[in-house]
Amino acid sequence: MVLKEHLANKKILFLSVQTFNLEVEIKNKLEELGAQVTYYDERPANNNFIKGIIRLKRSLIQKRIDMYYETILVDTAKIKFDYLFVNRGEIVPAFFLEELKKAQPNCQFVFYTWDSFTNHAHPITILKYFDRIFTFDSDDAVKYKINFRPLFFLDGYKNIKNSSPLKSKYNLLFLGTAHSDRYKISSTLVNYCNQNGLTSFCYYYMHGKLVYLYKKIFDNSFK
């Protein structure tokens, strides 16, 4: 109730990558709590090519990124926002935050990330622009002296503990993006399962064939 009263009629500029429809769920929840949300994908496009370039060599499309954020400034110039809410901050440029701060001095800048800074270092360079900063990574919270906020779950899972138990098909299940040491660690666990009569299933998500080929050739953890 307190949160609903606080967000009632507040205008929020929400920037987030598109990830398994979570950005839509967040937007809908904020609106359910009474906020008026203007959403933009953090990336200039959501195709696998752009995702791959951002991860491998962002400078190749930096001009396009800057133009995209200049357009956001123009499109939102007539709206007086109460909050800027950036989720993840993978490519949000510093000039955008500086210009928005000048144009909207009463707007509070809030940052949250559900990714570790070891996977995406760019957000570290823009943290200084935010009034409130949160991360799901407890190590990053300590290292960078920012607020720790554990990863959330959707309302649809609130009552999952009360549902009827299902027979498990697998003893070990991994679903996630293949980055850092995840593939190496999960492969070790799969081998352990095979040697001890346990069942396992792993599904690795990657941002397109370009990223996969790069990892396969240059990243030893994928050998």
Go through each PLM region and give its residues.
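Short, flexible loop segments at the rims of nucleotide/cofactor-binding pockets, characterized by
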Residues: S59-I65, V86-G89, V110-S116, N220
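Short hydrophobic patches on amphipathic alpha-helices
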Residues: T76-A77, K101
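Proline-aspartate-enriched helix->loop->beta-strand connector
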Residues: K80-D82
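Short alpha-helix within the catalytic core of nucleotide-sugar-dependent glycosyltransferases
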Residues: L97
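Active-site proximal beta-strand in glycosyltransferases
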Residues: L100-S116, F134
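Conserved nucleotide-sugar donor-interacting segment of glycosyltransferase catalytic cores
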Residues: S116-F117, P123-I124
